[in-house]
A protein has these predicted regions:
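Cytosolic juxtamembrane helix and N-cap/initiation of the first transmembrane helix
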Residues: 1-19
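Alpha-helical membrane-associated segments of multi-pass integral membrane proteins
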Residues: 99-140
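Non-cytosolic membrane-interface motifs at loop->transmembrane helix junctions
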Residues: 36-46, 69, 100-103, 108-110
């Protein structure tokens, strides 16, 4: 098996992992009833857009579809940081509300351990990075 074949199989595997992640994440969020506020729909939207980009790159890996995948996966990863910020700021606000004597510094650790899981949105960062890795030195994107 040539190196090109191995690289192509690895790209397909990574696309599969990204697709599974982008399907399972919204499913878990539905189970957690993560649908009460408008901002809670962000992971659903970016997961859907990510799935469309993955499907395009899987079905027809062209320069255009791979660039779309790259940029979409960057947006997926960035949205994850928005989620981490929202989770942390919600926990921090709640901690300061129930402990008015706390300074912001005192509230940092309890906010990190709060009811909104700080790192849970990070799964989309992982999906985004893996999706971008698929495009790394892809033959369709390499100049001849």
């Amino acid at each position: 098996m040539s190196q090109a074949d191995v690289a192509q199989r690895l790209r397909r595997f990574l696309l599969g992992v990204v697709a599974v992640t982008l399907v399972v994440t919204p499913f878990e969020l539905i189970l957690l009833e993560h649908t009460e506020e408008t901002l809670q729909w962000i992971p659903f939207v970016v997961s859907g857009l990510g799935l469309l980009a993955v499907a395009g790159a899987w079905i027809r890996p062209s320069t255009t579809s791979l660039k779309i995948l790259r940029w979409t996966m960057a947006a997926v990863a960035l949205s994850s940081f928005v989620g981490m910020y929202l989770h942390f700021s919600g926990n921090l606000a709640f901690t300061l509300e129930i402990n008015p004597s706390y300074s912001v510094t005192d509230a940092l650790w309890p906010a990190m351990k709060g009811s909104y899981p700080l790192l849970a949105p990070g799964i989309l960062t992982l999906a985004g990075i893996l999706g971008m890795a698929v495009t790394y030195r892809h033959p369709e994107l390499e100049p001849e």
